[in-house]
Design a protein with these regions (language model features):
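Electrostatic cytochrome c docking/interface patches
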Residues: 11-26, 255, 311
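Blade/loop signatures of beta-propeller domains
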Residues: 101-125, 234, 297-307, 360-380, ...
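Short pre-active-site segment immediately N-terminal to redox-active cysteine/selenocysteine motifs
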Residues: 27-38, 43, 73, 85, ...
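Acidic, Gly/Ser/Thr-rich repeat motifs that build Ca2+-stabilized beta-propeller blades
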Residues: 85-86, 93-276, 324-327, 333-336, ...
């Protein structure tokens, strides 16, 4: 009988593994003898067939490793491996299990020539722009049918109502620092744009200066402005949020930057910029979601406004690198998606004053496979609604509000960079009840958005392009 157990390695030499040993080494030394070098099983059962005899949740697997089962020949690993190392093994097993399960799966691959089938709707892809864009980041829709697209390098481009890329870009934009993952990122129209003309931009604000050795030093942090476009010129600029220069970082990672508007407020994200514990520090903007009036003033009812040690614009904290932010049109609930490290990408329900845990708790580990933390939950810290292991590199988020795909109405569309996919999540009573991959292997999905025409617009990186999803065969 093939029991699904995490069995002991034959022989106890070399069991004490250094904390920074990579997870593949931990597995090879302590687990492969019974479960196979490829997780296929042996004395112990397979770890990739999905048939868990003693509970298949992450907590169950962690407990099986830590506590063992002497009757079935498994040594308790607690005291030999640290909690962090055991947690990294759980993530590693999940990655390999997912890899095995995905083999042979026929994902809905988009095509401009053929119809792509999904559970509820069939569609085809129409390419609007496949030449001329350079690292597009976000899209916004003007009332006259034109689209605005940001390019990470600092340009704001226009796509005509006919779907052609205008060769001229907008002049006079604020200077953005194109460095690492940062640059010109988010663009959004004020909800009353037709009356006031305001357009909001999120970008890496900072400086490039030579140090005393003549080497260029770059320091930046995410900032938000608004302005108006007249002809091809950016005018009437106002700062909505510009962090004090003392908060600028030389890191090139984790800028965040997405916007949501609601009832006169703007919500926006600043990533933790690689300073992990800064996400827990209310005196710093890193790793926070902000809520301000749409003119940049601080609301009097913000959760930390009376805390003298906190930045008053902070709405929530403990975030790593959110690159998706969206509001449910049915009830006004706000959700974010944020990149985990290796594993642990998250979808969170955003509620005022709450701590989302990074980096104290996470469902991921370091990119190099070394352990990070040994706990995934802690009192006073929020759990994600769902998390993805392995990571899909969540980026771009929108509730479908159009009428072209009626069976997807109010479903949440989640883009993925690394996995090159869009997932459709059904949310009921603020819980995820199902998810489906509806778009796969057509480029790194940077942004996904419902257009005013009801079609779904997608920006991809790698092959930089703008495409849209059109119903077919319904």
């Amino acid at each position: 009988m093939n029991y699904k157990i995490l069995a002991t390695f034959l022989g106890l030499s070399g069991l004490a593994v250094a904390q920074k040993t990579k997870v593949d080494g931990i597995y090879a030394t302590n687990c492969a003898g019974c479960h196979g070098a490829n997780f296929e099983g042996g004395v112990g059962g397979s770890l990739i067939d999905g048939d868990w005899k003693h509970g298949g949740s992450d907590a169950d697997i962690f407990k099986s490793i830590a506590k063992g089962n002497l009757q079935l020949g498994m040594t308790p690993w607690e005291g030999i491996l640290s909690n962090e190392q055991i947690r990294s093994l759980v993530i590693y097993i999940r990655e390999k299990e997912n890899e095995a399960q995905m083999k042979g799966v026929n994902f809905p691959k988009p095509s401009v020539k053929e119809v792509t089938k999904t559970e509820l709707h069939d569609y085809r892809i129409e390419t609007l722009v496949d030449k001329g864009l350079n690292n597009p980041w976000a899209i916004a829709f003007l009332p006259d049918g034109r689209k605005l697209i940001t390019e990470k390098g600092g340009k704001l481009r226009i796509v005509t109502a006919e779907g052609k890329l205008d060769p001229k870009d907008i002049e006079g934009l604020p200077e953005s620092i194109d460095f690492g993952q940062g640059g010109l990122m988010e663009v959004a129209l004020h909800p009353d744009y037709e009356k006031n003309g305001w357009i909001y931009l999120g970008f890496a604000d900072g400086s490039r200066e030579k140090n005393d050795k003549g080497k260029e030093e770059i320091r930046s942090i995410t900032a938000v402005v608004r302005g108006k476009i007249k002809g091809y010129k950016w005018t009437e600029q106002e700062w909505i949020y510009r962090p004090d220069p003392k908060f600028r970082s030389g890191s090139g990672v984790h800028f965040g930057t997405r916007f949501v508007f609601d009832k006169g407020y703007i919500y926006f994200v600043i990533g933790e910029r690689g300073g992990m514990m800064e996400a827990q520090n209310l005196a710093r903007p890193n790793g926070k979601i902000f809520r301000l009036h749409d003119d940049g003033k601080v609301p009097a009812d913000n959760p930390f406004v009376s805390n003298p040690d906190a930045i008053p614009g902070i709405w929530t904290y403990g975030h790593r690198n959110p690159q998706g932010l969206a509001m449910d049109p049915r009830d006004g609930a706000i959700y974010d998606t944020e990149h985990g490290p290796r594993g642990g990408d998250e979808l969170n329900l955003i509620e005022p004053g709450k701590n989302y845990g990074w980096p104290v708790i996470t469902h991921g580990m370091n990119y190099d496979g070394t352990p990070m933390v040994g706990i995934t939950e802690k009192e006073g810290m929020e759990q994600p609604l769902i998390f993805w292991v392995p990571s899909i590199a969540v980026c771009g988020l929108d509730f479908y509000t159009g009428d072209k795909f009626p069976k997807w109405k109010n479903d949440l569309l989640v883009g993925g960079l690394v996995k090159q996919e869009i997932r459709r999540l059904r949310i009921e009573n603020k819980k995820v009840v199902s998810q489906e991959i509806i778009f796969k292997n057509f480029g790194r999905v940077r942004d996904v958005a419902t257009g005013p025409d009801g079609f779904i617009y997608i920006l991809t990186n790698g092959q930089d392009r703008l495409v849209r999803m059109i119903p077919a065969g319904d």
